[in-house]
Amino acid sequence: MELTPREKDKLLLFTAALVAERRKARGLKLNYPEAVALISAAVLEWARDGRTVAELMHLGTTVLTRADVMEGIPEMIPDIQVEATFPDGTKLVTVHHPIV
């Protein structure tokens, strides 16, 4: 199976998000890469569902709370940018202050 670099990046992100999801389900606090992966994967899935950029910018802030991540992580992630595929093309989605 031949994958483009972009497809490989998406698979890596999705795998990291699965690990983060499982750790969160076990009650572990997420670290920086896990938090970014989980939020990014959620945004990509919602974009695939047909949500708008504005909706994704808001929904991205609802994935995790301070209680879900290690101390200091919310301050390390002022925003997350995700290149998502929409029905009308690819767009850059920026989620400001994703962990409240």
Curated annotation (Swiss-Prot):
GO terms for cellular component: cytoplasm. Coiled coil: none annotated. Keywords: Cytoplasm, Hydrolase. Its EC number is 3.5.1.5. It holds the Pfam family Urease_gamma. Signal peptide: none annotated. Pathway: Nitrogen metabolism; urea degradation; CO(2) and NH(3) from urea (urease route): step 1/1. It is an enzyme of class 3 (hydrolase). GO terms for biological process: urea catabolic process. GO terms for molecular function: nickel cation binding; urease activity. It is found in: Cytoplasm. Its main location: cytoplasm. InterPro entries: Urease_gamma, Urease_gamma/gamma-beta_su, Urease_gamma_sf, Urease_subunit. It catalyses: urea + 2 H2O + H(+) = hydrogencarbonate + 2 NH4(+). The keyword Phosphoprotein does not apply. The keyword Cytoplasm applies. Belongs to the urease gamma subunit family. Heterotrimer of UreA (gamma), UreB (beta) and UreC (alpha) subunits. Three heterotrimers associate to form the active enzyme. This is Urease subunit gamma. It comes from Delftia acidovorans (strain DSM 14801 / SPH-1). The lineage of its organism: Bacteria, Pseudomonadati, Pseudomonadota, Betaproteobacteria, Burkholderiales.
